[in-house]
Amino acid sequence: MKNLLTNPQPSQSDYINAIVKLGSRVYEAAQVTPLQKMGKLSERLHNNIWIKREDRQPVNSFKLRGAYAMISSLSAEQKAAGVIAASAGNHAQGVALSAKQLGLKALIVMPQNTPSIKVDAVRGFGGEVLLHGANFDEAKAKAIELSKEKNMTFIPPFDHPLVIAGQGTLAMEMLQQVADLDYVFVQVGGGGLAAGVAILLKQFMPEIKIIGVESKDSACLKAALDKGEPTDLTHIGLFADGVAVKRIGDETFRLCQQYLDDMVLVDSDEVCAAMKDLFENVRAVAEPSGALGLAGLKKYVKQNHIEGKNMAAILSGANLNFHTLRYVSERCEIGENREALLAVTMPEQPGSFLKFAYVLGNRAVTEFSYRYADDKRACVFVGVRTTNEQEKADIIADLTKNGFDVEDMSDDDIAKTHVRYLMGGRAANDNERLYTFEFPEQKGALLKFLETLQNRWNISLFHYRAHGADYGNILAGFQIEQREQAEFEQGLAQLNYVFEDVTKSKSYRYFLR
């Protein structure tokens, strides 16, 4: 493995040799995981589909492979000094268990707002935890600082040849489990898993197609491919937190650019639908990033009309907060085009509801919200069960033909996350501005929010609903005069929360203003 560490750009053969040599070593901590057939989904999509069950690892994710590969390769002197890492997720647990298995000290620096369930998990695997900083970048900076002070080895989450090679042992298993795969779909966060899997499979199966899958709101590889080099994202979504990476690694980008055949981006609703498929097919409960590869597989098959092929995706992890499942159950039907969310305007007069019901006929209504607004028209928020995109189009056409104004809200995130729970009627606030905030799930966060803004501006609307993630999503309305807009946004900047002005949202216009 000497070439892997001394060559600034290790070759494919350098990586293959390292993966083969690490194969026996990694299994001192990790396990060979099954490649399981998804029968129902295979029938539905007319392809043979397998799922690689990395949720069966001792830390419930693939991250153990790369962490153990690197830590076990350290010199005796490095091992004696211990290892350090920065993470609020699966990498932290992989490093902690690897160090415990090898009898080493492990210090994990985690952001101060890390949920206690994740802190306890790291401690349960034998790691010492230091809570520091408001976000991952601050925690990482502290970890690197301490690694120099204490002479401990910093274990990166993805951008290191040994970590990449460790993840590649997963692909070695896949070769032995199904010999004739046509496609493999791999989730991309920092790129370590995708790079390790692609470089090995392309060596032994040159014709195989390796497809990278990213979340639309944290697509750091796509941004790097577009620019030609790794670049920082200005904002990342946090639902699939296991792949919520601001910047892809330099080495992982080099390998992904060379060995991936294509990319597909998926949204959170499509991820939720894939999580449901995993449960229904193999009774696995995946974390959102764990289901990302399968979500990409489903989308790619439909977009490219592929049939009769052998395909695999990786269930990369299952470390999720149980309360996340409530959000998943609400959103998975939209991700499969099995539910349409519509805003319907009708005359405010007797018989309108009955006519509306006649047009819908025997279709299953999943949600129906209405409140009186004025004497002329009524706006109704309705969910209707559908079987596909065409049926939704047919419903909209039927309603329009019968004199109803219809807006499709199925892709309106404000409607799906907030407005469907806020059917209290309109407010005559001409100077109201509407904002969304990513809100940390930690003690004192709401107090900080109110102390910064409440004394100066009146809050006219507020909606928050927890769904088990490290960050929640808040919708808030403020009464702001036009001349105060700049001053108000300066106040928002002091919060250090991600925010967006959504005053022009069509769901806000329909139901709340």
UniProtKB/Swiss-Prot annotation:
GO molecular function: pyridoxal phosphate binding; threonine deaminase activity
Keywords: Amino-acid biosynthesis, Branched-chain amino acid biosynthesis, Isoleucine biosynthesis, Lyase, Pyridoxal phosphate, Repeat
Catalysed reactions, as listed in the record: L-threonine = 2-oxobutanoate + NH4(+)
Binding locations of pyridoxal 5'-phosphate: N90, G189, G190, G191, G192, L193, S316
Residues that bear N6-(pyridoxal phosphate)lysine: K63
Pathway: Amino-acid biosynthesis; L-isoleucine biosynthesis; 2-oxobutanoate from L-threonine: step 1/1
Gene Ontology biological process: isoleucine biosynthetic process; threonine metabolic process
UniProt KW Amino-acid biosynthesis keyword: yes
Enzyme class at the top of the EC tree: lyase
Domain ACT-like intervals: 340-411, 433-504
Function text: Catalyzes the anaerobic formation of alpha-ketobutyrate and ammonia from threonine in a two-step reaction. The first step involved a dehydration of threonine and a production of enamine intermediates (aminocrotonate), which tautomerizes to its imine form (iminobutyrate). Both intermediates are unstable and short-lived. The second step is the nonenzymatic hydrolysis of the enamine/imine intermediates to form 2-ketobutyrate and free ammonia. In the low water environment of the cell, the second step is accelerated by RidA.
Subunit-level organization: Homotetramer.
The name this protein goes by in its record: L-threonine dehydratase biosynthetic IlvA
Gene designation: ilvA
